[in-house]
Amino acid sequence: MVKHFAVIGDPIAHSLSPLMHNAGYKALNLAADYQKFQVSPEDLQEAVFGLKALGFSGWNVTVPHKETILPFLDELTEEAVRAGAVNTVKVDKGRLIGHNTDGSGFVRSLQEHMELDECKQIVILGAGGAAKGIAMALAPFGAQLCLMNRTPERGAELVEKILEGGGQARQEPWGRGEWLAQADCVIQTTSIGLKKEEYPFSLAGIRPGTLVVDIIFNPWETPFLHSAKAMGCKTVNGIDMLLYQGVNAWEFWLEDKAPVESMRKALYQALAV
């Protein structure tokens, strides 16, 4: 019996998730497929119950539905509760289980480049949905999280949530260079750079060798990463975050190890890198 999976969002045409998951199914000769569906906000409830009625085993959820889908689910995992958002749904004996693999996917990708237990200070630029998932997943590792956001109120809300969960966090003014100089890792989570625009403040003072991450992966190297590389930093884009959130979703659905390298190869080929 073929298992059906999908991703829903608006827009969705750009999604690389079907390529990644279908390559994984092919690598393991699994009877499964993965599709993408454009679902507008007003059609979300109908789509959720439609996928369930059609016998889908699970689906991913992307912008703008990660929070608005919550009322239509029967249960949330601890990761989903902590993030306050869902990017993965599993149908289990007729119940819809909401899960979040964004944060764990980011952590898994970051661990390929640094020992998180040895990291003392991490600067996170932005305080939107992506920053929230990343910050809540990083907090248990014990690093001091320094948030910088253009809208201080939103940053303050995220700091409070981290502190309530037992993590260490504070907010600093957007673009304060001295905090960049103290960071072991800097994570750029905003949309700045999608159109190849320059970052609105300088990275002057950042230490050579600092790990600098931009969760954007197209363009492959944003102006932000280009500047960091020019200053001697180790740079990483968001492609492996996409990979590992997909890998973690796969393992949540199928309760088995995903073929990581086959899924990675499909992503890299799609982006011609």
Swiss-Prot record:
<feature type="binding site">
    <location>
        <begin position="149"/>
        <end position="154"/>
    </location>
    <ligand>
        <name>NADP(+)</name>
    </ligand>
</feature>
<dbReference type="GO" id="GO:0009073">
    <property type="term" value="P:aromatic amino acid family biosynthetic process"/>
</dbReference>
<dbReference type="InterPro" id="IPR011342">
    <property type="entry name" value="Shikimate_DH"/>
</dbReference>
<comment type="pathway">
    <text>Metabolic intermediate biosynthesis; chorismate biosynthesis; chorismate from D-erythrose 4-phosphate and phosphoenolpyruvate: step 4/7.</text>
</comment>
<feature type="binding site">
    <location>
        <begin position="126"/>
        <end position="130"/>
    </location>
    <ligand>
        <name>NADP(+)</name>
    </ligand>
</feature>
<comment type="function">
    <text>Involved in the biosynthesis of the chorismate, which leads to the biosynthesis of aromatic amino acids. Catalyzes the reversible NADPH linked reduction of 3-dehydroshikimate (DHSA) to yield shikimate (SA).</text>
</comment>
<feature type="binding site">
    <location>
        <position position="215"/>
    </location>
    <ligand>
        <name>NADP(+)</name>
    </ligand>
</feature>
<dbReference type="InterPro" id="IPR036291">
    <property type="entry name" value="NAD(P)-bd_dom_sf"/>
</dbReference>
<dbReference type="InterPro" id="IPR013708">
    <property type="entry name" value="Shikimate_DH-bd_N"/>
</dbReference>
<feature type="active site" description="Proton acceptor">
    <location>
        <position position="66"/>
    </location>
</feature>
<feature type="binding site">
    <location>
        <position position="78"/>
    </location>
    <ligand>
        <name>NADP(+)</name>
    </ligand>
</feature>
<dbReference type="GO" id="GO:0050661">
    <property type="term" value="F:NADP binding"/>
</dbReference>
<keyword id="KW-0560">Oxidoreductase</keyword>
<keyword id="KW-0028">Amino-acid biosynthesis</keyword>
<dbReference type="InterPro" id="IPR006151">
    <property type="entry name" value="Shikm_DH/Glu-tRNA_Rdtase"/>
</dbReference>
<feature type="binding site">
    <location>
        <position position="87"/>
    </location>
    <ligand>
        <name>shikimate</name>
    </ligand>
</feature>
<dbReference type="GO" id="GO:0005829">
    <property type="term" value="C:cytosol"/>
</dbReference>
<dbReference type="GO" id="GO:0008652">
    <property type="term" value="P:amino acid biosynthetic process"/>
</dbReference>
<dbReference type="Pfam" id="PF01488">
    <property type="entry name" value="Shikimate_DH"/>
</dbReference>
<dbReference type="InterPro" id="IPR041121">
    <property type="entry name" value="SDH_C"/>
</dbReference>
<dbReference type="Pfam" id="PF18317">
    <property type="entry name" value="SDH_C"/>
</dbReference>
<feature type="binding site">
    <location>
        <position position="102"/>
    </location>
    <ligand>
        <name>shikimate</name>
    </ligand>
</feature>
<dbReference type="Pfam" id="PF08501">
    <property type="entry name" value="Shikimate_dh_N"/>
</dbReference>
<feature type="binding site">
    <location>
        <position position="62"/>
    </location>
    <ligand>
        <name>shikimate</name>
    </ligand>
</feature>
<comment type="subunit">
    <text>Homodimer.</text>
</comment>
<keyword id="KW-0057">Aromatic amino acid biosynthesis</keyword>
<dbReference type="GO" id="GO:0004764">
    <property type="term" value="F:shikimate 3-dehydrogenase (NADP+) activity"/>
</dbReference>
<comment type="similarity">
    <text>Belongs to the shikimate dehydrogenase family.</text>
</comment>
<keyword id="KW-0521">NADP</keyword>
<dbReference type="GO" id="GO:0009423">
    <property type="term" value="P:chorismate biosynthetic process"/>
</dbReference>
<dbReference type="GO" id="GO:0019632">
    <property type="term" value="P:shikimate metabolic process"/>
</dbReference>
<dbReference type="InterPro" id="IPR022893">
    <property type="entry name" value="Shikimate_DH_fam"/>
</dbReference>
<feature type="binding site">
    <location>
        <position position="238"/>
    </location>
    <ligand>
        <name>NADP(+)</name>
    </ligand>
</feature>
<protein>
    <recommendedName>
        <fullName>Shikimate dehydrogenase (NADP(+))</fullName>
        <ecNumber>1.1.1.25</ecNumber>
    </recommendedName>
</protein>
<dbReference type="InterPro" id="IPR046346">
    <property type="entry name" value="Aminoacid_DH-like_N_sf"/>
</dbReference>
<feature type="binding site">
    <location>
        <begin position="15"/>
        <end position="17"/>
    </location>
    <ligand>
        <name>shikimate</name>
    </ligand>
</feature>
